[in-house]
Curated annotation (Swiss-Prot):
GO terms, molecular function: double-stranded DNA binding; rRNA binding
MTERF repeats (start-end): 142-172, 177-204, 209-239, 245-270, 290-318
Spans through the membrane: none
Localization per record: Mitochondrion
Assembly, per entry: Heterodimer with NSUN4; this interaction may be required for NSUN4 recruitment to the mitochondrial large ribosomal subunit.
Organism: Homo sapiens
Region (Disordered): 322-381
UniProt comment concerning the protein's domains: The MTERF repeats form a half-donut shaped, right-handed superhelix, where the concave side displays a positively charged path for nucleic acid interaction.
Official protein name in the record: Transcription termination factor 4, mitochondrial
Domain of life, source organism: Eukaryota
Compositional bias per record (Acidic residues), positions renumbered to this chain: 340-381
Annotated keywords: Mitochondrion, Repeat, RNA-binding, rRNA processing, Transit peptide
Length: 381
């Protein structure tokens, strides 16, 4: 009996030790409650379009009065949104818990909730989930949605179809980050426009499927470019500069403006530092690498590649712009002259037709007179 009593006392001594051990091993439980309240701090959105208000009941991330402050915050938020308090608080906590599981920090979640602009919490969660499935990390997702919050209003089915289409183009598995930074409208633009750009690169520019994927990844601005301008830019590199397909892809040539390309290329050409290769791909002088022409700043280009002063290059750019204006004006004059010639030819043809019609009428009149004379002769006989 005495032994049993000692055993009971030992159990009582072990109970507080067990709870202390559990508290040390799971410190995140209390922290998670504080985190949830801190995340709710900036969720109050005005009904006229998304101005975030700081609520006085929330003080800092380190100390939050719970549960009264949290209840007041959620109630204030949901009253502004016209949502039932119990239902809305549960939805907020569920969405925030999901975002935390995806790897978003407190700051990330605050930013995302501040840019949702009328989109429902479920819509926000669905769109973000699609981005995560495409291989994006939390930081790029926040940057893209802050830059283009209209993406949150996309129908989720459209988002999923576009995601599947981009994966077929090879833009999944983390390759979509740069595309979204440079061209976030890839999810909102017509799929036919994307198809037209891809078809142009494959059929007219003769890039391989792998090269097209690399171009879309490294030069996503081609998706916004006029197709005629894009084709001319490729032809300028291939025929005028003598650059082959692998070098065009490797140097990311298509991301640069045609003005910049022509200015630097023609400047080097007139300095005698660049030659268009012959049919065998040979030149009398070694041409500078494309990366040393386009992928450097203007100061570095002039100092290392062209070896001239800034003043000389500025004068050249003005002269080149004047030459192109004169060339365009002469081209327009030639077109106008050719149109005038065509109109004159049409007028001459119309006049010839009128003359022929008059001749036909005269012949008909002569025939009618001859027939009348023959009839008169017959009557006299």
């Amino acid at each position: 009996m005495a032994a049993f009593g000692r055993q009971v006392l030992d159990w009582h001594r072990l109970i507080p030790l067990t709870w202390a051990c559990m508290a040390r091993q799971t410190p995140h439980l209390g922290e998670q409650r504080r985190t949830t309240a801190s995340l709710l701090r900036k969720l109050t959105t005005a009904s006229n379009g998304g101005v975030i208000e700081e609520l006085s009941c929330v003080r800092s991330n380190n100390y939050v009065q719970e549960p009264e402050c949290r209840r007041n915050l959620v109630q204030c938020l949901l009253e502004k949104q016209g949502t039932p308090v119990v239902q809305g608080s549960l939805e907020l906590e569920r969405v925030m818990s999901s975002l935390l599981d995806m790897g978003f920090s407190n700051a990330h979640i605050n930013e995302l909730l501040s840019v949702r602009r009328g989109a429902s919490l479920q819509q926000l969660l669905d769109i973000i989930s699609e981005f995560i499935l495409l291989g994006l990390n939390p930081e790029p997702v926040c940057v893209v949605l802050k830059k283009s919050p209209q993406l949150l209003k996309l129908p989720i089915m459209q988002m999923r179809k576009r995601s599947s289409y981009l994966q077929k183009l090879g833009l999944g598995e983390g390759k979509l980050k740069r595309v979204l930074y440079c061209c976030p409208e890839i999810f909102t633009m017509r799929q036919q426009d994307i198809n037209d750009t891809v078809r142009l690169l494959k059929e007219k520019c003769l890039f391989t499927v792998q090269q097209v994927t690399k171009i879309l990844h490294s030069c996503p601005s081609v998706l916004r470019e006029d197709l005629g301008q894009l084709e001319y830019k490729f032809q300028y590199a291939y025929f005028r500069m003598g650059i082959k397909h692998p070098d065009i892809v490797k140097s990311e040539y298509l991301q640069y403006s045609l003005t910049k390309i022509k200015q630097r290329h023609i400047y080097l050409e007139r300095l005698g530092r660049y030659q268009t290769p012959d049919k065998k791909g040979q030149t009398q002088i070694p041409n500078p690498l494309l990366k040393d022409i386009l992928r450097v700043s203007e100061a570095e280009f002039l100092a290392r590649t062209a070896c001239t002063s800034v003043e000389e290059f500025q004068v050249f750019k003005k002269l080149l712009a004047r030459e192109e204006e004169e060339s365009e004006s002469s081209t327009s004059d030639d077109k106008r002259a050719s149109l005038d010639e065509d109109e004159d030819d049409d007028d001459e043809e119309d006049n010839d037709e009128d003359d022929n019609d008059e001749d036909d009428d005269d012949e008909d009149d002569d025939e009618a007179e001859d027939n009348d004379e023959d009839e008169d002769d017959d009557e006299e006989e």
